Amino acid sequence: MRRRTTRALIAALAAMLALVVSACGSGGPSAAGDDRTIRIGAWYPLTGALASFGIPERAGADAYFKSVNARGGINGRTIDWIVKDNAYDPQQTVQIARRLVDQDRVVAIVATNGTAQSQATFPFVLEQSKVPVLNTLGGDASWYQPARDGLFGLQTLYEDQAAALGDWVARDGAKKVLVVHSDPAAFLKVAEEIGPAARKTDPSVRVKRLPVKFQTTDYSPVISKVKAEKPDAVVLILASAEAASYLKEARLQGLSTPMYGYAPVAAQSTLTLAGKAAEGVRAVQLVKSPHDDDPAIKEFRAAMAKYERGQPADFITLWGWAAAKAFVEIAKTIDGPVTAESLTRAYENARHVDTGVAPVLSFSAGRHLGTRDVQKVVVRNGRWESRGDFFTPPVRD
């Protein structure tokens, strides 16, 4: 009898030990570091073809987190932001997510990069581990319609950027609009939103699309087709390098039709590659111009110079800065431990979060995308300048 009792006790202790080891070995909602540190994580393409985005985005967010830590952190807690290189690969990103959650025990994924890459982690991070993913630099409408537990974003969707452009060209008086877009489905999906938005503003506007093979470098035949259409305005749904190729060829062929673009067009790389051909181009952006003279932008430029020397204070670094600042503004409202659960509650209760550099954000239990607003920018004297304030595009059908 004593032996059976002893064996039963040993088995019970072993089971308890297994539970303890299991709990210690995973991240999950209760992972919170200690009361002096807030441990969060992210992945970026720091190598490979997309490193030109990943490196500056990381630098912008890191500059803000460093500046907050220099001022004492979030309510006395230091931010420990763990960043790993995913080379823009979804499979690598899943493995990175497991390390961040299980080994580093982060309480959230914050200001990370990539739509497909982040989405690949959702089954493990959001659904299994219950770790929130906050302020991703990327996103898709399906992420937020309906709202998903633990997933909150702050970047206006490409489709809403297109709606803003349709409204803008119509208000500028264009009656015949040509949308030049790369041929993959992702670009077409955005281009298709311009016509309906333009016609909501002015039913007489006619919109036609001109697809271009992705990564085309010779835009001479494209410009010839544009000239033949004789549009009042051209909207570019192209990557920055291709937009620059379009602009240079348009200038070479004497095409002076007003040109508009979505946020990927409004990049420093477009100006660098296109030179004088970019003068006068209009676009929408997710943040204010980094050349603006208001205090929040000045703070950004000063912090970049102090903490991330060698990295430009441009739109891409400002995206990262805005994502980091929004997180801090919301996290500092938490009274008590900063955990996955408390962060999720804080986001659901966050209203009128103003970073000073991006649209004011508001969330709720049913609204996990904080804004639809964009900023108009125009190239003047070789640099992007803000025009007016952030505005909300027409509601899409």
Task: Identify the function of each model-found stretch.
Residues 1-39, 70, 395-397:
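Short, low-complexity disordered leader/linker segments with a strong preference
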Residues 25-33, 52-56, 71-142, 212-219, ...:
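Beta-alpha junction/loop-to-helix N-cap segments that form part of ligand/metal-binding clefts
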Residues 31-60, 84-91, 113-114, 180-188, ...:
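Extracytoplasmic "Venus flytrap"
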Residues 33, 38, 59-81, 199-203:
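Signal peptide-proximal N-terminal region
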Residues 92-95, 140-142, 149-254, 291-298:
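Extracellular/periplasmic Venus flytrap/periplasmic-binding protein
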Residues 100-113, 132-136, 176-181, 230-240, ...:
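Periplasmic-binding protein-like
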Residues 247-321, 390-395:
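Extracellular/periplasmic periplasmic-binding protein-like sensory domains
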Residues 306-317, 328-385:
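Segments of small-molecule ligand-sensing domains
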